[in-house]
């Protein structure tokens, strides 16, 4: 799916039901994200700020996220304790 479509779903599905992904059995709801221009394998986390490749040299940069059962967090706060690191692939999670 294109980065633009994913951004549209994030914005269109907020606040409910929301756009989410599953990583290591946990659900993460993306609350805010922007379009970015980086390349990598689809679903690959490109840096330590949770920028996720979507192909065609485009990616989504997550700005706000909510881990299942937790409060919403800005991405800087979230990444301090996150197990999702650069190089992780969310397609294989």
Located regions from the model:
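An anion-binding loop in the catalytic cleft
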Residues: 1-93
